[in-house]
Amino acid sequence: MNLRVIIDGRPLVPARSGIGVHTAEIAGRLDVTPSPVIASHAEITNRQAIEHCRFRVDHAPNGILWQQFVLPRIADADVLWGPHGTIPITLRIPAVVTLHDFSSITMPGRHLLKTVLSFNVFISESLDRARRVAAVSKAIAEEAVRWFGVPRRLIEIVPNGVDDFFRPGDGGGDYILFVGTLEPRKGIADLVAVWNSLPEPRLPLMICGDPGWRVRVPSGVGVTGWVDRERLRTLYQRARMFVYPSRYEGFGIPPLEAMACGAPVIATRTGAIPDYAEGAALLVDPGDREALRAAILRLQGNESLRSELREKGIERSKQYRWDRSAQLMTELLSEAAGA
């Protein structure tokens, strides 16, 4: 459809976390002409999945200042997509804002101060100004209604997904895998404590993701840092099990990617994880270390259960595809623009 779209590209700078993946996978699939413009305050070096988009860089030392003062001036389009929860408060064109979670409000001590301030200061005004709101899960939509009074009719569920890149491999690995930014709310302290309590010989623990902050990983635990998609897929495919003990999530992409790659999954009941993983993974309550330990021991010693979860996870992941999410976002942007 003919629709001029400009996208706040801050989640794509410098490296992609979950919100960056969401932004890129949907932006690259938007069915609009001309191709969308991704604007940012610094160069976007990883253009995987967004090769067909157009780019605009207006260098600024701070992403929030750029969003609030530069983006409104350059937003010459029919509609803006704010994929990171906020939009410029002086924006003069229609906008759609995507909500991933409210952890900076519910768990401020588990975020950097600049993250808390940038989100909490602008979220209420952003939701008031947005024509439409996308939420990655029903849980986040309900929180937006309850805390900010967003009319439910304005909210569309646009979930995260996977594509055919994440597929089963040959397996063969003997390690427990965690993938995600190393930050307090991801429950890494719970995972490390439980892993340390496992009887010897225990499977190695591999932690993969950006360094983040306020998380100390002891010696003896493998840490890969950020890895590219090819390496990430291989890690998923070869894991004996994937464990995601997050204390709070809006959606949680890594368990879905792990399921698509055939890794048996243990995760917590938070955000959208029960929506897509119930019955296809072992789920425990956030912060329940005894239940997490029991689940790891159960899965480690039961090959038939691992095989069952592998097959169920692969099938379940097929219900969550980026193509469908991009279609929903295209429709939402069109509605917001009045096209």
Language-model features: where?
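Carbohydrate transferase catalytic cores enriched for Leloir-type hexosyltransferases
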Residues: 1-339
